[in-house]
Every structure is written in C-alpha cells, then in structure tokens.
C-alpha cells in the first residue's frame, strides 16, 4: 500500500513539474508579443491594457497560432482567414476597445466586454438588461438561449470542457454556444502570466 502511494505521489509530482514547464513555455511565447501589443495599443484610443490583451492571447491560442487573438471569425466570418499576428492583434484590440466603450456606455462591468469578445457585442446589451454584471449563470443562459441556437444547436446539446475553472461549475459547455467561462479564464490568466513572469 505504501509503495503504491509513493508511486502515485511521484507520478503526481512529475505531472505538476511537467505542467509547470508547459505553462511557463506558453507564457514566454505569449510575452514575445508584448512589444507588438504595446505598439498597437499606443496607436489606438482604448481602455484596453497590455496585460489584459496578453491574457486574452494566452486564453485564445497561448501564442501558438498566427491568428493569436482568433480574430478571423469576427473579421471575416471565416476561421483562420487572418494569417498574420500583427493583423490579428490589431483587429482583436479594435474589437476589445469597441466592446469596452460599449460596456461603459451601457453601464456594465468591463468583464462583460471581455466575455462579449467570445459571445459577440450583443451580450453587452443583454447584461445591461439583466443586472449590469457578468456572471457564469447569465453567460450560461445566454449561451444556451442565444449563441447556441443562432449557430444551429436548438436542442441544448452540451459537451464536457476540461478546464479547472469549468470543472468547478460542472464542466459543461453548449455545442456552438461559445465559452461561458471565457472572461473568468482571461481573469485567471492575468494572474498566471504575472506569476510565471517571475521565473
């Protein structure tokens, strides 16, 4: 029994070390875009900041794809139509800046603007009519009743989403319904990048 427990602890320790290495590698890859993000923000009148944009890049692609902010769909309606990181960041920052301005105008919290990056700008009006504060419950309802049906999921079909923040809340997402945990993941990744930047 003791040998089995020792083996399990060793495996867990190796897994944690490996995951820490992977996360650190991904953070460093994202941080390589910092000068590009700073330049783009300097050229725009925006309430977005460098750390927020970098956290969104980490959430979207971990810096591992040319379309680092997954801007293609909001830009052209097609996946992977943007093949240049600078263009991806420029479009992503423009969309985020637009969302932040709309959120301020509507009197909702800034995390609603971040969630709207995933759900679409109409989510800002939805939150304005439902308490002015983005929550997982509101995001879940919006995903199920608005986003998913608009993309063909009218039956409420779900799938399991393996992310720690999702697992805490049950771990399910609606097929074609966006990511109800998106703003929370970005928020979490802000701290993750800050922590990993120390090493």
UniProtKB/Swiss-Prot annotation:
One of its GO terms (cellular component) is cell surface. It comes from the Bacteria. It is found in: Cell surface. Transmembrane segments: none annotated. Pfam families: Lysozyme_like (PF13702). Its main location: other. This is Pneumococcal vaccine antigen A homolog. It comes from Streptococcus pyogenes serotype M3 (strain ATCC BAA-595 / MGAS315).
């Amino acid at each position: 029994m003791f040998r089995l427990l020792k083996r399990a602890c060793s495996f867990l320790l190796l897994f944690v070390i490996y995951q820490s290495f992977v996360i650190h590698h991904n953070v460093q890859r994202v941080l390589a875009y910092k000068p590009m993000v700073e330049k783009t923000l300097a050229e725009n009148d925006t309430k977005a900041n460098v750390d927020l944009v970098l956290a969104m890049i980490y959430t979207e692609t971990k810096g591992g794809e040319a379309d680092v902010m997954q801007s293609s769909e909001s830009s052209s309606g097609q996946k992977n139509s943007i093949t240049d990181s600078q263009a991806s960041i420029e479009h992503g920052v423009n969309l985020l800046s637009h969302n932040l301005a709309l959120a301020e105008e509507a009197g909702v919290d800034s995390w609603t603007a971040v969630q709207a990056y995933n759900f679409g700008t109409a989510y800002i009006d939805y939150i304005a009519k439902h308490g002015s504060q983005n929550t997982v419950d509101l995001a879940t309802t919006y995903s199920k009743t608005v986003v998913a049906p608009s993309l063909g999921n009218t039956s409420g079909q779900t799938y399991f989403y393996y992310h720690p923040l999702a697992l805490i809340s049950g771990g399910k997402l609606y097929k074609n319904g966006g990511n109800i945990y998106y703003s929370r993941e970005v928020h979490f990744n802000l701290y993750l990048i800050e922590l990993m930047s120390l090493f």
